Amino acid sequence: MEHTYQYAWVIPLLPLPVIMSMGFGLFLVPTATKNLRRIWAFPSVLLLSIAMVFSVHLSIQQINGSSIYQYLWSWTVNNDFSLEFGYLIDPLTSIMLILITTVGILVLIYSDDYMSHDEGYLRFFVYISFFNTSMLGLVTSSNLIQIYFFWELVGMCSYLLIGFWFTRPIAASACQKAFVTNRVGDFGLLLGILGFFWITGSLEFRDLFKIANNWIPNNEINSLLTILCAFLLFLGAVAKSAQFPLHVWLPDAMEGPTPISALIHAATMVAAGIFLIARLLPLFISLPLIMSFISLIGTLTLFLGATLALAQRDIKRSLAYSTMSQLGYMMLALGIGSYQAALFHLITHAYSKALLFLGSGSVIHSMEPLVGYSPDKSQNMVLMGGLRKYIPITRTCFLWGTLSLCGIPPLACFWSKDEILSNSWLYSPFFGIIASFTAGLTAFYMFRIYLLTFDGYLRVHFQNYSSTKEDSLYSISLWGKRISKGVNRDFVLSTAKSGVSFFSQNLSKIHVNTGNRIGSFSTSLGTKNTFVYPHEPGNTMLFPLLILLLCTLFIGSIGIHFDNEIGELTILSKWLTPSINFFQESSNSSINSYEFITNAISSVSLAIFGLFIAYMFYGSAYSFFQNLDLINSFVKGGPKKYFFHQLKKKIYSWSYNRGYIDIFYTRTFTLGIRGLTELTQFFDKGVIDGITNGVGLASFCIGEEIKYVGGGRISSYLFFFLCYVSVFLFFFLS
């Protein structure tokens, strides 16, 4: 056992050989390396699989009750200062190791087929393998300075992958947005680390937790300074985990390839912020003000993310706001001290969200032959619908992932979300109300995504191409170059100016028999157009979906309570028992059957109500409800109907425009900073340069005058002599 722990440092380094091999291959024999590029996927998956085996072995030992293991190397800079670095294996580390390696392996397998036709295939695998290495290094770090080092590497890899198709201006802009937004949080994190080093003289977790347990309660250190430094640490997690108000980068990060979206949202970048708060939770617990602030930010984020997802048309962007909302649940759980519930939801959400993102990648892959490679079309749910007939395996996987995120038992997210809701009600009714209401919203917008994508009919064949922009005749290839679309313009929709209602009246107004006429039609000129239909992706892309489906079905069992001779336990609570975090889970985590059933009924009822409302407005039964004039039967009379319409319009506008937060940031910060730079430029050019140029010009003019006076003319000498005498006499006589 001890022998296994001694070699745990190998886990983060295992993916590095294939990264270096690809780099040397591209440098020394680029042609051969590119021709054999598909071969590099196998060693990438193999090495990460070895890391997964190590991680599983360590996790089994942690579950069986092993103690915490920490190994440190010391680098002595001088007699007064030494830098320690090493690795730490505890329950939190083992959980994150399994999460990163399992999801990472499945994403690599999926990417081999998804990115097979991309010119940047090797570059993608280098980035994603280094991404996994950086995240593995982050979770095994034993002190804050190591965490910050790998924190920056994780951010760097995410920026490279978000802007992977850098020839597309919108992808380059999304990369810059993610970089600038995270710079705010990373700068705060660095200041917080330096602040605690100044307070304690150490960056080790043991020393920080010792101070949190002993010094802070006894007022032996400046509490105000400690709160400020803790807030700065939390600021880093706010940016990395897309919490309000630094969440604006996450939806734009969808400009990267879909596999990396799955990895970022499931097990790497956004999970890093949750991991940081979980790792430092003993420090934050000693500061009640910071804990209250964490729970407040989490509550705002979970509600905001849910409302912004209500009216999005892009399937990946909708899932991105869903991730933002679920991260808010985790942050809320950590803020109220529900450590186990937060980690439980981190696990269940990771597998469910990876399933949904990879499923959306299969949907996009199937739509590209119809609409081209432009993300504005291939990811637009307005053009989808009826895909259950063409990609049934993807549809089944996506449906189970959707139901899991909605909180339907016995799927994974039901168990973790129900635990968070129960603890929220016990901590504060305010948090409980918002968290429960958002659970209903989650069911609504997630089932909306499913219905718009898979239910009804394939709408792309029944839309008129109405764009007048020249760019609409072009599509974006897999590697970002503009190419002419080989798609019939009679059934391609440009949605740049078309309005889609919050409740999709415009999506189902089609005769019931039109579905039988799909196939071909003749235009007025007599030309016959044959439609292209979506198709299921290859087995390489379907295999990760099926594995993630199994995880979504059964991973929730680790949090199900079982009775033993001592009391109620779960596999997860047994796993987390020997924790370095020096605190115990609150007693309310162990609940009786009646309380569990009561909480479950209320949360499932909210989820089912959200599903019903979504099906009522977006399902195939919408035409039936519309014929019954069901809405108008509830909203009779002019004023009430007008109020309902205006409310619906306001909600749609709020959601579709991202809560106007991006607009506010653009006008306040972007335009404000631009105006300040223009003012600075004017001051620099007009005042500073004016003074400098004025001095030079004045010197030149004076020199010319002196030169003219000293030219040997007697009249000039007499004139200046009389002037000097006059001035002298004036001052002398006065």
From Swiss-Prot:
Subcellular localization is given as: Plastid, Chloroplast thylakoid membrane
Q: Which residues cross the membrane?
A: 9-29, 39-59, 89-109, 125-145, 147-167, 185-205, 224-244, 258-278, 280-300, 327-347, 354-374, 396-416, 425-445, 542-562, 605-625, 714-734
Q: Which reaction does it catalyse?
A: a plastoquinone + NADH + (n+1) H(+)(in) = a plastoquinol + NAD(+) + n H(+)(out); a plastoquinone + NADPH + (n+1) H(+)(in) = a plastoquinol + NADP(+) + n H(+)(out)
Supply the alphabetized keyword list: Chloroplast, Membrane, NAD, NADP, Plastid, Plastoquinone, Quinone, Thylakoid, Translocase, Transmembrane, Transmembrane helix, Transport
The record describes its membrane topology as:
Multi-pass membrane protein
Q: What class of enzyme is it?
A: translocase
The reply on keyword Transmembrane helix is yes
Q: What does this protein do?
A: NDH shuttles electrons from NAD(P)H:plastoquinone, via FMN and iron-sulfur (Fe-S) centers, to quinones in the photosynthetic chain and possibly in a chloroplast respiratory chain. The immediate electron acceptor for the enzyme in this species is believed to be plastoquinone. Couples the redox reaction to proton translocation, and thus conserves the redox energy in a proton gradient.
Please report the name of this protein according to its UniProt entry. Answer: NAD(P)H-quinone oxidoreductase subunit 5, chloroplastic
Q: Which organism is it from?
A: Oryza sativa subsp. indica (Rice)
